[in-house]
């Protein structure tokens, strides 16, 4: 069954169909902490919006949200307003991680990780990039995917792509209702907002 059966944008459908049709590629993304939902699971999200309140509590997001994958913690990778890619965590955190699905796939397949919230500075990024590419076991299938889609492979340029996503505005927020707190930055609850602001400031300078 094709992801055309869902209400996901055409470009997202193209990638999900490609990944889902190749077990090795799907497994590779799973090990990158991007576990792609099957078509029926995505349709369930479309038909039953209770998933949002079950996960986030009563709240009002400032984007239209369409889940397409999850990570090992139960957090969701989502399409925002049919364009940007965001993340909703299980502890009240959320944010934009890429300006579009092309850049999301580029970052994940070359970084070989979905732990984007841990990349709040350039030094951390290069360290994780080197470690992941050294240890990753399914690099062959991802290398083919990267080449086929003409993705950027230079770490400094990939970091730039990541920064463009995480500093994209308006920021993805969920406004809490009925006594629930608002969402907070992907960089953490206590000093996460300060980290995000520093990340933006460093990028803009």
What are these language model-derived features?
Residues 86-126:
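Compact, glycine/acidic-enriched structural inserts
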Residues 125-135:
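Hydrophobic alpha-helical interaction segments
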Residues 1-83, 87, 122-123, 136-205:
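A surface-exposed partner-binding patch
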């Amino acid at each position: 069954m094709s992801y055309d059966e869902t209400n996901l944008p055409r470009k997202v459908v193209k990638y999900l169909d490609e990944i889902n049709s190749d077990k090795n590629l799907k497994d590779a993304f799973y090990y990158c902490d991007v576990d792609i939902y099957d078509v029926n699971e995505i349709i369930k999200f479309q038909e039953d919006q209770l998933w949002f309140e079950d996960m986030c509590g009563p709240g009002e997001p400032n984007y239209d949200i369409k889940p397409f994958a999850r990570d090992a913690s139960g957090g969701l990778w989502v399409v925002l307003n049919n364009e940007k890619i965001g993340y909703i965590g299980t502890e009240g955190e959320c944010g934009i991680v890429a300006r579009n699905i092309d850049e999301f796939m580029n970052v994940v397949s070359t970084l070989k990780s979905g732990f984007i919230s841990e990349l709040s500075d350039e030094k951390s990024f290069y360290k994780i990039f080197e470690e992941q590419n050294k240890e990753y076991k399914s690099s062959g299938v991802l290398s083919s995917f990267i080449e086929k889609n003409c993705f950027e492979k230079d770490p400094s340029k990939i970091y730039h792509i990541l920064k463009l996503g995480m500093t994209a505005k308006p920021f993805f927020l969920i406004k809490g209702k009925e006594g629930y707190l608002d969402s907070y930055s992907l960089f953490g609850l206590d000093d996460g907002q300060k980290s995000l602001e520093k990340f933006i400031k460093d990028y803009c300078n």
